[in-house]
């Protein structure tokens, strides 16, 4: 498949749903539905005609998606394997690099490559070189040669250089991938209960672009290039045990708010790029916010509580690296406490 924004939106959604809807899954195999190509990388024509700001947002979002499944083993006990058959180039190899284990078939057409420098005179945009040298510990001289080779590296050399973890004969590839996935699943000590369904977000967009969620309102002031984000505090007591939290599902306050805030950040980033100032306000009872946080932390070893905490970590990181001027206003009636105080 081709690494485009639409593909990464779907990939991000899949990774999130694997954590919340299928916590019983221990190994995820990432492979292509086509025989001759694993992933061809970014849509060069799309990027060639795109504004610089869109390119920045595209690369930032795709790297955030890769960071999410790269950390899935440590944070959620889900191991990602890249089963590479065919060309794996540019953003396609960066997809594989974020996995915990890369398996490459040994045939005449399968290779890994970062051809951005020889083809486009730009560096890989979503962490390719960093993961090659810092994560996979490829020698710097080999990394220099590798990123200057348009044709990439195949077979035994890819394994010898550390660009992949395994090279498998084509006739044994599918069998070996399945075997390796079973081995990794068997070695996992991940314990999880029944997953929850992540339903559609309740989002309404008015004619002037203002946005309303169930827990967030966003007002746009285009004259002053400003977006005012108002977060509502909880109204009810929190679930106090894992069973109650699971029963609440995607309607539990901290999970619902995290999903809505994440969606709001991405919407403003990609669709309202002229709004350079974000003002964040809160309304509600700070004591009740603290109660919700304390209840979640008291059961943090429960799989769903852990996933909600990990989601908040990702949302706050996304906010932190967003290229906007962001101001938080703490005033009478606000509820910047506990988890919401992290926004400050």
Name each model feature, range by range.
Residues 2, 39, 94-98, 137-249, ...:
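Amphipathic alpha-helical segments at domain termini/boundaries
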Residues 4-53, 63-83, 105-109, 226-229, ...:
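A structural preference for short, pocket-lining loop segments at secondary-structure junctions
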Residues 10-19, 106-111, 125-130, 202-218, ...:
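Short charge-dense sequence patches
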Residues 43-51, 98-100, 165, 245-248, ...:
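Short secondary-structure boundary/capping segments
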Residues 45-47, 107-111, 131, 191-197, ...:
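Generic detector of short, locally flexible boundary/turn motifs and exposed helical patches
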Residues 54-192, 301-343:
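Conserved catalytic cores of soluble enzyme domains
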